[in-house]
Every structure is written in C-alpha cells, then in structure tokens.
Amino acid sequence: EVGCGRGGGASYIARYFKPKVFVGMDNAKAEIKFDKNYYHVKNLKFIYGDAMNIPFKENNFDILLNVESSHGYVHFEKFLKEVKRVLKPTGYFLFADFRNEKSIKTLINSLCMSGMKVIKKEDISRNVFHALNFDNERRIKLIYKYLPRFLHRWGRQFVGIRDSKLYNSFGNRKRKYFYFILQKD
C-alpha cells in the first residue's frame, strides 16, 4: 500500500486476507515509526518511501493499493508510472480517492491513459456522503474525547462532520470520490 498512513488498512488486510507479505509505505517518517511499533503482524512490514520513486524493483508486486493518499501528490502521472513499473505483468492497481469538481476529469483521464487496463471505475460519492452522515455522532464524540478544545473546529472540518465544508462538498457533488481497478498488461 502506497500512502499507508497510520497503518490501519494495511493491518486489516494482512490479518484478514492473509497475503504472503503485505508492505505498507508512507513518506511520513513519524507514521512509519508508529506503524512499526504498534502493529505486530507476521506478514506485515512498513517502510519509508516516496510515491514518486517507489523503492522496489520492476515487476515486483501482484497488487498495489492506494487509498485517500494521491490527492496530495504533486506529480500524479509520475506516481502512475511508478505503479506500472513495480506491478508484475497482469498485476492489479486498486485505487480510491476524491477530487474537487475541477480536477476530477484530470484524475479520470490520467488513470484511463496510464497504460493500464481499466477493469472497473465507479463514482462512490453518494456512498461516502451517506457514510459520513451515518457515522456523524461517533466521530463527533471522538473529536471531543481526543482533541484539545482549540482543535475541535478543525477536527470537525477534517473528518467531514455534518454541515462541514467537506461533508457539504460531497452532498452538493462539488467533490467526487471514485474507485478504480486497473490491470497492467
């Protein structure tokens, strides 16, 4: 997984889907340090690395995962070239992320023109909006429990609490969330 962050998704996949090896990579050294200290799963390892220069040889992975990380990449097309380089022939790229209405077409075009075959593409914005709505109260409680008071407003915006800018942008379709499954030829 490129952009594994705090490692929760990587840990879940390693424990429940039991791949031979699962590698979580992130460009935040503090996150990788946390992941290495917190997760103790036999088939899971974490490394520091840059999505624009994935530190693995060509044709190395069966599957590469990228969830809610790429919206922060300055050179998305370079990242896609790296994905294609490190995937084995017939390997899969599983991708999910959001963009605002101005940049969603660029994202879709970049993925479709990546040189990998698009197996599936779906707009899941409505699902994300409904999930934010459904999980609203639990996330509010977490904000008030774990964040100092001066960060409450920021926390509400960051996690998309009802009526926040993030929440409303999914509701009014100014922000869209897509997932793709691509395959290297």
PLM region spans:
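A short glycine-rich, Lys/Arg-flanked "PGG" loop and its adjoining helix->strand segment in the class I
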Residues: 77-89
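Conserved S-adenosyl-L-methionine
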Residues: 116-127
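A short acidic, Gly/Pro-enriched loop at the edge of an enzyme's catalytic core
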Residues: 52-64
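Conserved Class I S-adenosyl-L-methionine
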Residues: 126-132, 140-183
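A short SAM/SAH-binding and catalytic strip from SAM-dependent methyltransferases
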Residues: 63-74
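Conserved beta-strand signature within the Rossmann-like core of class I S-adenosyl-L-methionine
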Residues: 91-97
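Class I SAM-dependent methyltransferase "Motif I" SAM/SAH-binding loop
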Residues: 3-7
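Class I SAM-dependent methyltransferase SAM/SAH-binding core
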Residues: 8-53
